[in-house]
Amino acid sequence: HIDDLKGCGNDAARERLKKQLAEDFSDDLKEQLHEFEHIGIKHVQNTSTMEVYTHQNHYVDQLHPINVDLVDRTKEDSLVAGVVYALFRSLLGAMQWLLQTRGDIVPYVGCLQRHANTPTVKHVLMINRVLRWCKHNKIGVLFAHIPGPIAMAVIADSAYKCEPDDIDCLAMR
């Protein structure tokens, strides 16, 4: 079962790969080219330069800061609980999802992750600040076209168990 495969190449290489996948698995393949959204990430290819820009800016637009009226901002070291705790954890999960295309927020999200179980008012203010940054700085990842011979890199998103007696399903093969 192949659930996701992203690739790039010239038309002939793409057709060869599609043919092989159809022979090995099924001809029920869905191909998306040039501009599409896949697993929440938008992909936009410049058909002149062949560069591909990926981003999650549409997802950022859907996120909302935590209402700071729910906390006492004069007590930044106070632990948050209840609904604020739940909102913090939810927004932190959203920020973690953004790390696929937002390298600019990695250190901040990493810092907030260390306090995921015991967030304080200060962390609520911090996560709101990171969200504001994301909303005001719409960025993503630009993949440049690299001409040359065909190469394939495969990164699996699931565990495999090839043989019935394999006990280590996470073995590198």
Question: Where do the language-model regions lie?
Answer:
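Residue-level detector of intrinsically disordered/flexible regions characterized by low predicted structural confidence
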Residues: 20, 30-32, 44, 140
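Divalent metal-binding acidic/histidine catalytic loops
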Residues: 50, 55-173
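Eukaryotic basic, amphipathic alpha-helical target segments in cytosolic regions
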Residues: 13, 25, 29, 103, ...
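Catalytic palm active-site di-aspartate
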Residues: 1-9, 33-44, 60, 94-95, ...
